[in-house]
Amino acid sequence: MIEITAEIRALIDKAAAGVELAGDEYIDPADGLIHCKKCGGQRQTVVPCFGKSGYFMPRCICQCQREAEEQRKAAEERQRRMERIKRRKAQGLQDRYLYDYTFANDNGKNPLMDKARAYVENWKEAYKNNTGLLLFGDVGTGKSFFAGCIANALLDQDVPVLMTNFPTILNRLTGMFSEDRSEFIASFDEYDLLIIDDLGVERSTEYAMEQMFFVIDSRYRSRRPMIITTNLKLAELKNPPDLAHARIYDRILERCAPILFDGKNFREENAGATRQTAKDIVNSKQD
């Protein structure tokens, strides 16, 4: 900081004569410069003129102005992040019901959910090592909910995730030219995590198997993790019926650690609760 000499002070006092102060500012008699009433910091400084003699007194920001600016920028960044997450959820969770697949909505009945939480907690390591999951087991045992909880939790952390299924993918590919299909499949690599739900429900036509292979192989080559859910048994995946299935399943088994879902049918349990609620409604009497 420049020492305020008598010469400089005279220049400061001359400049101060015509200055307009804001309501939270005052001129400090000690140095003649503009200060903040709140923090007492300088809002004016003394700078030597470059290349010639003399000085000028530009405005500067005080501590509380600096903090206010940092808070404003932080608030703007939070807003941008929220909007970005909202867009990513709209893109990554293509079915609205998936928004409800969250850890907050977990009823605690499935002990495997601890593994879902662990996957999220160790996501950086999983991503670095291209570690995926293969969730297999009977219908209604919570595989999709497990995967959806991971998807929502990572999306909330601003991680790009896509949760989809092969019928949806194949429907989108129908009618596309070869170049467009390649671009569409390559677009999956924009997501740090790709979740394919219900592998095995799609029709096993030659065209479908070829496109499924392209999707899985593209993901395999990108070295980015994927999570697969399926009602198929592990033995079926390890002993595929033909070469077309083998090419797909081998890549999945290499990249995805298998987790067996062999508990109760939660979907049937929920359906029973729904039936009871409906029964209570239709049998109730108005007063």
Predicted regions and their residues:
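Short glycine-rich substrate-engagement loop in P-loop NTPases that contacts/grips substrate
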Residues: 111-120, 128, 151-191, 203-210
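Hydrophobic/aromatic beta-strand patches that form the interior of the parallel beta-sheet core
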Residues: 133, 162, 195, 227, ...
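Pre-Walker A (pre-P-loop) alpha-helix and adjacent loop at the N terminus of AAA/AAA+ ATPase modules
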Residues: 93-133
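Walker A/P-loop nucleotide-binding motif
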Residues: 127-147
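Loop/turn-to-beta-strand initiation segments
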Residues: 159-160, 190-193, 222-228
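A short, basic N-terminal segment
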Residues: 1-107, 269-287
